[in-house]
Amino acid sequence: MVELKPMEMGEILDGGLTLYRRHFGLLIRLGVIALWLPASINIYLQVTGGALQHSVLYVIVALLQYFCGLFLTAGAIRIISDSYLGKETALADAVGLGASKIIPLFGVGLGKGLLLGLLVVVIGMLAGVGVPLMSGSGVAGLLFFAVVFIGAIWLLAFVACGYAVTTQVVVLEPLDGAFDSFGRSWELTKGFKRKVANIAILAGIIFNIPVGVVSGLAQGLAVSNPGLSAVLAVVAALLPIVLTPLLACVFTLMYYDLRIRREAFDLQVLSQQLVSS
């Protein structure tokens, strides 16, 4: 059981890596169960011409991987949460919970995507209309537009950080409805959105750099070294099995850190332990 206490950003990342290493075998088995089919199809796509040659299949497997990723994320959150609270979780428990949370997580993800997508569209329209208008207004006009545009980007990041732990809320808390996770996540992140942003950026780098580098090398070597390119394409297709649980580890610890800071969750757990003993 990890010590229940408020954590700094480095402690959350280090704790996430520690839990990931501790349960690596269980998380990988869950990852294989969740992603073996989309990973296999992705490998086939990569070695037979890629998305341009199989556009319809590419879209289908992308959707399949998304839903399987929801299953994997929910199951991994269960494993990490139980470990953090000093409990043991069997693979069957993680699989059962993961399967039961696919639809709620899809609904929440769709709602979040629509909201953030709408903000992106508004920012794009602002840029498309504002640049021509302000270009004739001199330096003052351009500076004003720059301030407004930066403010819009800040708003997008602020909203995204406010809803950063909706997934953990859906998986770990009893809710009347999945969309209650939006208000709950916003409440937990109140006052800590900069910290959430920093952790999300670092976690995103940890996840995306290996995938991006391996995928880029595979594409770059497609002509000069097809054999090595095929091997790298296989590795790129398998990386989500390894890396998706790592993201779940980091964000789950961040969720508990927010609960400890906002709700004294550590004292709640301690009182329950004292009562049970």
Region locations from a protein language model:
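Nonpolar helix-loop interface/hinge motif
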Residues: 1-50, 88-91, 153-230, 236, ...
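Membrane-interface segments at transmembrane-helix boundaries
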Residues: 1-22, 67-143, 160-194, 249-277
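Membrane-anchoring/interfacial helices and their immediately flanking loops
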Residues: 40-60, 136-147
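Membrane-embedded or membrane-proximal helical elements that form or frame transporter/channel pores
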Residues: 52-71, 238-239
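Alpha-helical transmembrane segments and their immediate juxtamembrane interface regions
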Residues: 63-65, 143-165, 229-256
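Hydrophobic core of alpha-helical transmembrane segments in multi-pass integral membrane proteins
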Residues: 123-125, 148-153, 216
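Membrane-interfacial helix-loop-helix connectors in multipass membrane proteins
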Residues: 129-148, 218-235
